[in-house]
Amino acid sequence: MAETKIIYHMDEEETPYLVKLPVAPERVTLADFKNVLSNRPVHAYKFFFKSMDQDFGVVKEEIFDDNAKLPCFNGRVVSWLVLAEGAHSDAGSQGTDSHTDLPPPLERTGGIGDSRPPSFHPNVASSRDGMDNETGTESMVSHRRERARRRNRDEAARTNGHPRGDRRRELGLPPDSASTVLSSELESSSFIDSDEEDNTSRLSSSTEQSTSSRLIRKHKCRRRKQRLRQTDRASSFSSITDSTMSLNIITVTLNMERHHFLGISIVGQSNDRGDGGIYIGSIMKGGAVAADGRIEPGDMLLQVNDVNFENMSNDDAVRVLREIVSQTGPISLTVAKCWDPTPRSYFTIPRADPVRPIDPAAWLSHTAALTGALPRYGTSPCSSAITRTSSSSLTSSVPGAPQLEEAPLTVKSDMSAIVRVMQLPDSGLEIRDRMWLKITIANAVIGADVVDWLYTHVEGFKERREARKYASSMLKHGFLRHTVNKITFSEQCYYVFGDLCSNLASLNLNSGSSGASDQDTLAPLPHPSVPWPLGQGYPYQYPGPPPCFPPAYQDPGFSYGSGSAGSQQSEGSKSSGSTRSSHRTPGREERRATGAGGSGSESDHTVPSGSGSTGWWERPVSQLSRGSSPRSQASAVAPGLPPLHPLTKAYAVVGGPPGGPPVRELAAVPPELTGSRQSFQKAMGNPCEFFVDIM
């Protein structure tokens, strides 16, 4: 004898009910359904049924004619009984408590296997519970009913009628319950004022459970308590809206003439409420699905050709799929896209992850950091005198310094720079923990992914084979490391990134030059046994310190030269600055005539004495031309301190250490070495005496 199964949801209750009518599905009417519900006040409810509309697809249709035929899907009728506005209070109490002893349904209904979007379900919490194997649903229902009875007896006045303190204790849930944690985080923003309850929905639009929230004021208090109980559950999911949980359903038509097999493996999900749907487990290379590229692991299979998998058991769905694949002709697959295209597991539940608010300021700063909109490296308020050109020179000459502008990656780029880009979070390379022989490899990559990334993101590779050779070179240079230290590169192996700091010892200032410029061409330091009075002029003119740095301090009682020079220095330091500035020696006059070629401007200089270090730097002609005498300039500083050195480009007196090789002026030094030394001086922030590369 034919029979019809009717599955109906009572108002706010989470567990649906199942009844069987001894009537054929095509002849069952609303009156037949109401006769089964004779122990319920059916006049107090509105009846909604799952129906199919040509324009909108699956909808909820209200039927109030007792003689109307009920819409049926696969031999089942799905209905929702919603308490009508203005219904008597007995209807609500009977609707929630009279059928608590009915057993739950045996078939899958409203779980994750249902192809309806989440907005179709009036009970979002119920539909979400089918996604995992949590067993706390029944205990949650019993706790809520017990709490409702306790509230009816003794509930004190509370803000918005919502308790904020002992939510976990009242629910009887452990402190680490994900749903209660999210509820406590979001409860302050999930409720509205209690006085505006009559015509206002208390739930967000994403849950769409506000149909029955408008009741007469006579029973508003009792209904508000029940509504708050449901809101506790709904607020746990209020952060998962339609934008993150709605099913993106696509239909893919595959031409099986070009490919010999479909190329997918499917898995079925089941829980204590029945089967939960068919999912794409993995995709095999060379198949029709892999060639199309739109279907990914984790997608839910809803329909194959004209056969709908809705409310179909997993065994039946697998049998139907095998029959269709064995036939010839194109195959159309209708799938619901998964929430995460690259899940760590095929069934990642979004509500298991905590939802945090977004800080716009942190978002913008992070975006600016990744796009390169950063302040200049190493700048400070006191170094504003350094121009952009010198700052760029510093950045380009010091290895490892961040570049001001992001340059495209090519095969000629530094390998360490390419590795740094590969390790960025948004580089496109999948870096995650992987399992190999029951060993967890942290932050590992697959060799094939590395080759694909290099071939896609680095310019200059004509073939993928060249990118593979480059990856092998990265392994040899230590930028990639195998788990067991294999030296041959394989695309099937897992690799981790090596320590970039291990290569810093081999870096020097001339890392970008080649040939003879890699060798030091400056004068070497003298032998330690050779006396070298540093009071002489420097062989090179180094730029002075920025204005923010104090002048170099010279101890008045310390001598760099011989004993006689030290006595002169001591006497000079005790005398006034004007006396010291007037000391001149015949040797200095000869050097001036020789170095300047008889220039008149050079004779106006005040040069440090050869016997005592009375001043560290040359004074420019511009200062003397303003009418300031050497006496007044020297007296402007304290005795024993060298005069302040302004930024100037005047050449120093050419001189070298005794016994050393001849030295050159700065103009005679090759340009690549000059820029490197000058940028090094700016980086150090203080004038240096001599700098020699240690090869």
Curated annotation (Swiss-Prot):
GO biological process terms, semicolon-separated: axon extension; axon guidance; axonogenesis; canonical Wnt signaling pathway; cochlea morphogenesis; collateral sprouting; convergent extension involved in neural plate elongation; convergent extension involved in organogenesis
Organism, by scientific name, is Rattus norvegicus
- Which gene holds the coding sequence for this protein? Dvl1
Biased region (Polar residues) positions are 622-635
The record's PANTHER family line, in alphabetical order, gives: SEGMENT POLARITY PROTEIN DISHEVELLED, SEGMENT POLARITY PROTEIN DISHEVELLED HOMOLOG DVL-1-RELATED
Residue ranges of every copy of the PDZ domain listed in the record? 251-323
Quote the InterPro entries the UniProt record gives.
DEP_dom (IPR000591), Dishevelled_C-dom (IPR024580), Dishevelled_fam (IPR008339), Dishevelled_protein_dom (IPR003351), DIX (IPR001158), DIX_dom_sf (IPR038207), Dsh/Dvl-rel (IPR015506), PDZ (IPR001478)
SUPFAM superfamilies recorded: PDZ domain-like, Ubiquitin-like, Winged helix' DNA-binding domain
Q: Where is this region: Disordered?
A: 89-236, 551-641
Protein name according to UniProt: Segment polarity protein dishevelled homolog DVL-1
